[in-house]
Amino acid sequence: MAEAPQVVEIDPDFEPLPRPRSCTWPLPRPEFSQSNSATSSPAPSGGATANPDASAGLPPASAAAVSADFMSNLSLLEESEDFPQAPGSVAAAVAAAAAAATGGLCGDFQGLEAGCLHPAPPQPPPPGPLSQHPPVPPAAGPLAGQPRKSSSSRRNAWGNLSYADLITKAIESSAEKRLTLSQIYEWMVKSVPYFKDKGDSNSSAGWKNSIRHNLSLHSKFIRVQNEGTGKSSWWMLNPEGGKSGKSPRRRAASMDNNSKFAKSRGQAAKKKASLQSGQEGAGDSPGSQFSKWPASPGSHSNDDFDNWSTFRPRTSSNASTISGRFSPIMTEQDDLGDGDVHSLVYPPSASKMASTLPSLSEISNPENMENLLDNLNLLSSPTSLTVSTQSSPGSMMQQTPCYSFAPPSTSLNSPSPNYQKYTYGQSSMSPLSQMPMQTLQDNKSSYGGLNQFNCAQGLLKELLTSDSPPHNDIMSSVDPGVAQPNSRVLGQNVMLGPNSVMPAYGNQASHNKMMNPSSHTHPGHAQQTSVVNGRALPHTVNTMPHTSGMNRLTPVKTPLQVPLLHHMQMSALGGYSSVSSCSGYGRMGVLHQEKLPSDLDGMFIERLDCDMESIIRNDLMDGDALDFNFDNVLPNQSFPHGVKTTTHSWVSG
């Protein structure tokens, strides 16, 4: 080994080689081309065709013998390595192969690199001779292609047949063309070689589960109930054919793919849309969402009262009111026509309307108008009826009327035996001490015709003969239209009986006047002449005699304009006012049976037996257009009947 000293001399050129983590061979370094030994460097040397070191280390016969093995090894290494090829000689390549065949050690570097292995098959640098041997790469084809052929020749471990195909064969092989699940398992173990050794419980869990899945997921298999008790079902081939192979999974009826459910859901959606469209079309005003309220414009249709009683929107409840009030609130009715109907009062929320009430179409015809006059004529001699109502500025208030029956010998202000307690909000008031002012804001400039006076024949008689007053009262009014803009009106609506004229306000109640007084004196202050605080108040009343053949009630217009604090005016609510109720009793009202003063500031409000402060704070202040305060006008009041007052201000923020 005379070459050992020479190898030691060239060791400094191979300092980057000691890398035991990879032992990459060859290392593409330019220093390799300057080395004198071809065996020490696997890289091709500069270009010497005959290397004396190679001839000295290995005889030429052995080098020629190794060349064939080297070429076969190169064919295996072609696919895994793709290094740039450097030009070299055949002798250098043969010498490198010989060095690998001697033991895999770097024989030239035994002194330093004894532990560095160079396995020839995995890391060969394809030297230059590869380009001279084109038939070498096809040699790798059979080696690499054999596993691919074996894997592509079979779809499954037992062959090309799928589970569904095996199940089909099993069912067809039976005499009755049907098998139970356990019989299918037995056929698999007996007929398919792959499953012969997999019949036990431990090794059969996987493929048996696959068979169950294929039976349930393929449409070509159907399940038939077994006649015997305690026996599993039969599995048969679908006589209709079904789909061969895998079909889409058959899911249970769900919301997504069930056609019947989709159809029923579509029908339900159509019904819901039609109901919503019908409700939206019921009202022509911005308050159409409250079209089923008795006082809304949409409620004055031919719908019966029982429909109103059965449908009550959530927005009318106390828990979901708009501004915190306890009474439902309607939107402004500015876009109503001249003939549209205003609503003055809402029904009480705590009471339910009777379902046996007549419909509007039955009680609003002209024939019932004449019957109303006859009924009113019956009342003119024996009794007079006083109705006390209250309404908020935008006609947005629930009320329960107070009925007072007085004999002819007594005045209108005498105590009455029958009444119904007035309730509003949280204030509890005595009904006889509660005769508030009726206010209504209206910007109309023309009178609306008295097109409906809702009273059925004989209902007024029932009012007199009944032991207790009716439980509900819905009062609606035709558009008055005489109020000035930005003003509140005090209406005096007097409906005269047949052949009677409007007398002075101080007369007895022998005339058939049904009044809505804005102030009601204590029964102890009953006088022959109605006087507010002892004052005789001037008034202007336009009366017209009622003729026997007229079908419309004659109105009495009493426009009054009373200046009140901070330029707030209260002008008369003149025009026609037809009053109707759920019970069908027609009532007409005069807001003042007394003479009104020209200036209300001079009145002694202490003697008024109504809670004016509660009314102003709770009712009048709820209107959006009202912005005033009565603190400096209303002194400390003492009510003779102990009226419970509330200082809560329900003004919407």
Curated annotation (Swiss-Prot):
The record marks 156, 163, 223 as: DNA-binding. The modification Omega-N-methylarginine is found at residues 249, 251. A motif (Nuclear localization signal) lies at residues 249-251. Residues 157-233 bind DNA. Keywords: Acetylation, Activator, Apoptosis, Autophagy, Cytoplasm, Differentiation, DNA-binding, Methylation, Nucleus, Phosphoprotein, Transcription, Transcription regulation, Ubl conjugation. The gene is FOXO1. Residues 119-140 have a biased composition (Pro residues). It comes from Ictidomys tridecemlineatus (Thirteen-lined ground squirrel). Residues 307-324 have a biased composition (Polar residues). InterPro entries: FH_FOXO1, Fork_head_dom, FOXO-TAD, FOXO_KIX-bd, TF_fork_head_CS_2, WH-like_DNA-bd_sf, WH_DNA-bd_sf. Residues 281-561 are annotated as: Sufficient for interaction with NLK. The modification Phosphothreonine is found at residues 24, 331. This is Forkhead box protein O1. The modification Phosphoserine is found at residues 210, 216, 232-233, 247, 254, 285, 296, 317, 320, 323, 327. Residues 1-64, 117-156, 232-335 are annotated as: Disordered. The keyword Iron does not apply. Residues 35-64 have a biased composition (Low complexity).
